[in-house]
Amino acid sequence: MNIEKLYPACKSIIWGGDKLKKYYGKKTDADPLAETWELSFHKDGLTCLADGTPLSSVATEADLGENCKGFSFFPVLVKLIDANAKLSVQVHPADEYALKHENSLGKTEMWYIVDADEGAGIYLGFKENLTKEEFENAIADKTLTDYLQFIPVKAGECYFIPAGTIHAICEGCLICEIQQNSNITYRVYDYGRKGADGKERELHVAKALDVTDTNKFVPKSLDVPTKEGILKGISKFFTATLVKVNGEKMLTKDEKSFRCFTCLGGEGSVGNVDITKGDSVFIPAGYENAILKGVFFGIMTTIRKYYIAVNLDSSSIKGEIVDDNGEVIVSDKITTKSEGADDELVSNIAILSNRLLDRCNLSVSDVEGVNIACHQVLDRTKSEDISRILGGIKVVFAND
């Protein structure tokens, strides 16, 4: 498969605007234009090639890369979103609930702020801990937004929204959203507005009560320089990197994952495909000598695998989150006693692992396992204890 320009599914929703048509080259009758699904294998809106063929019917397993093979659904969906009015206050379920109740993946997502009007912002999580009863009462008496954290935003910022986090995009935001391949949304507040049928849009309060994390939300950002650009968000479902080109940039061959590049500013080319602001291109896994030329920037979406690497020596436990290309995402360490007991070492390995995961917005289920290099005596059977403390994660010792 060659590098291909992508043609998105276009969505008209009542809160949409006209910026994607005016400034990002989208040609569609959809009015207002709320979303363009730049990379989508989802049945509700398939991304196509120039001849109208869905990408999902053309791309082979080899084109997608080996990192996609372990998923029951293609894992990621990339959108551009133009909010001319507030989106509903909503929440998305995690995988376990979504698979049981919706036969779908859940939805963890990431927002890269492409543009924002003065005063624009987002609602993201609760200001303080709430009980489920307090949450339900706030929905009933229409005071929910009083409890939500409003964050003013500006272009270039990035926000990671784990499944179960209540949120809403507000008017004046133009966003590149990288998310799990899911279209499941539970609305809990919609400002009383009516849809095209003249009726208030459906709410999904009971399901939202099941899945919403009502604890105080603390936003975390990720800005990690890599060979390709600046890493902005990671999960087992997607890796999003801000890529800037000023001249020429060669992409290394990647057998493990496709790449999808969404141009958010400037113009140039990706291989033999000319691009400008608003365009997305698909680069198949294993493609050699993909050259980016011009002056532009955007988000590169791939699928990576992540590991916790732990190194024990006589005075410390050092840990890293590492991807399958050997890129170190974050690192940390805990100082230990020279003759620490095994149980203490096990506890500290678990503490350090959780600390590393938290810094990356990762959960245990997002990583492939813990790899331990041990330069002091630690009973190998303790791998079972480490695994149990970390929720069943695979633990291996180097050279075992």
Model-derived features with residue positions:
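Short acidic-glycine-tyrosine-enriched beta hairpin
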Residues: 148-160, 271-289
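Short beta-strand His + acidic residue motifs that chelate non-heme Fe in jelly-roll/DSBH
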Residues: 98-100, 166-171, 176-179, 250-252, ...
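Short glycine-rich, Thr/Ser-proximal phosphate-binding strand/loop in the N-terminal lobe
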Residues: 306-344
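Transition-metal
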Residues: 1-130, 185, 190-219, 240, ...
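Short beta-strand-loop/turn "lid" adjacent to the catalytic site in phosphate-handling enzymes
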Residues: 359-395
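Loop-centered beta-sheet repeat module
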Residues: 139-184
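Acidic/His-leaning functional-site neighborhoods
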Residues: 221-275, 279, 286-287
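His/acidic/aromatic-lined binding-pocket segments of jelly-roll/cupin-type domains
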Residues: 78-79, 87, 109-112, 150-151, ...
